[in-house]
Regions:
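An exposed, glycine/acidic-rich loop-and-rim segment of catalytic or binding clefts
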Residues: 1-321
Length: 321
């Protein structure tokens, strides 16, 4: 299908591939090297058959929503409880990651994809138009997402690539730095407790570069700012054992970090016949803080008519020496 035929972007330093279904980032490579720096499947259809959100844009409401309920303007909007029958994760089984986006502009260095959601889609209000533009300049891949609506509606879209910079068996070979002083504590369902906590003297202190842990499972939202920035701000650095480095700058007020603890063990499904395994990639997801509609002290995610929701993220890569 054409929606799983990749769009290829090129610069003098990087190549990237995007699948129109899910606006999925399926490959990032240095021009002079063959290794894929994100999890990419040998069969592009496996990006959608294997439910790990690899490379997808997730939303319109990323992360977890308690009971799948969105309180808005005196009403409760019900989303699908697709996680243990209790929470809605990434807008349920029919979210943006499953949809066939239209290609509305394309050059060798950039591609813009678009999707329209009708009023009531995913149980949410408003006719919504969402555009995602991937572009490459030198060794920097940029993703800009913009959304508009004709009714107040929640909006929190996140990119979900899994990074693996050195091709080794798990992410414990990587070093991670997250420039955040606080994080969102959660309960056993990974729903916020309602406060934020300092990272100091906790397992979540990544303010200096240190190894990505395998235990306990890491799936936490770091608080980058109390609201969105107008321009991308540096927030994280990831370094592979071979010297490859990734720097992330974003306008988003949060960064969800997931160390891939619950990725399935599947033989030969990745490019070049490699296996997919637990901890086989790390997701670094700029976004708003989770379950914001139920947390009045968090940055809020309501998009109003005549406003534009916008998020810009730069992924700057440095090759091995």
């Amino acid at each position: 299908m054409t929606t799983t035929i990749p769009i290829h972007l090129r610069s003098d330093a990087l190549n990237a591939s995007i699948l129109p279904r899910g606006a999925t980032l399926s490959a990032v490579r240095f021009t002079q090297r063959s290794e894929n720096l994100v999890l990419g499947f040998a069969d592009p259809e496996d990006h959608f058959r294997i439910p790990v959100y690899a490379g997808h844009l997730v939303g319109p409401v990323a992360n977890r929503i308690k009971a799948g309920e969105i309180p808005l303007d005196g009403k409760i909007y019900q989303m699908t409880r697709n996680e243990n029958g209790e929470t809605c994760l990434h807008s349920g089984p029919d979210g943006l990651h499953t949809l066939d986006w239209d290609i509305v502009a394309r050059t060798d260095q950039s591609a813009t994809l678009q999707i329209d959601l009708k009023d009531g889609d995913q149980g949410l209000p408003g006719n919504r138009n969402i555009k995602a533009t991937y572009s490459i300049a030198g060794a920097c891949l940029t993703l800009e997402i913009a959304a508009r609506t004709d009714q107040p509606t929640p909006m929190n879209i996140a990119a979900h690539p899994y990074w693996m910079l050195d091709g080794l068996s798990d992410v414990s070979s990587h070093l991670l730095e997250v420039r955040a002083d606080s994080y969102v504590p959660t309960d056993s369902r990974n729903l916020p407790l309602g406060d934020i906590a300092p990272v100091a003297h906790t397992e979540f202190d990544f303010r200096t570069l240190r190894p990505v842990p395998l235990t306990p499972a890491l799936d936490v939202n770091f608080c980058l700012a109390p609201e969105s920035h107008t321009k991308p701000q540096s927030c994280a650095r990831l370094a592979g054992s071979n010297g490859t480095q990734l720097e992330i700058a974003t306008t988003a007020p949060g960064l969800q970090v997931y160390n891939g603890a619950f990725l399935p063990d599947l033989k030969g499904v990745l490019e070049n016949g490699h296996d997919l395994k637990p901890y086989g990639g790390i997701a670094l997801e700029p976004q708003f803080w989770p379950d914001a509609p139920h947390q009045p002290g968090f940055p809020q995610i309501t998009l109003n008519p005549r406003d534009t929701w916008r998020q810009i993220t730069h992924y700057r890569l440095t090759p091995p020496a």
